[in-house]
């Protein structure tokens, strides 16, 4: 009998970069959605952003993340499941390897597990904060509401 969906996700979270474990837990056609489905500008900053497929995508995406950031803390605060759906919530602290900027962000992960295999994963975080950990210089002029004065960030 395969492990329960929550057990599968727990094992994956403990072995994110272990090819043997990832290949045994992730279905060959699994979908990995990181932050959004497609955003060309964000993808330039964080190449793993968007949609990719298969166990190698899980390994490549997380491998790319951890070459750019030092994982200083990753804490799961809540994890629960309903049928094949597993929800994971928590927060992390990363330090950018390029600039040494530290960012803290909440995260959420939706995982679907069928027959003991991850078939879908969607990861969300504070993309503005994490992307800003790579911001060397520059600013934006932003206008958030019609008729209001633009401001610089």
Task: Name the predicted role of every residue range.
Residues 12, 25, 61, 65, ...:
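Residues that form generic nucleotide/phosphate-binding pockets
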Residues 66-153:
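A beta-strand edge to alpha-helix "cap/lid" segment located at domain peripheries
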Residues 13-22, 45-48, 65-69, 89:
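Short, mixed-charge, low-aromatic patches
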Residues 2-34:
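Short acidic-aromatic low-complexity motifs
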Residues 28-84:
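A solvent-exposed, acidic/Ser-Thr-rich amphipathic alpha-helical stretch
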Residues 1-2, 47, 51, 100:
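Alpha-helix initiation/capping motif
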Residues 12, 21-23, 30, 54, ...:
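Hydrophobic pocket/interface hotspot
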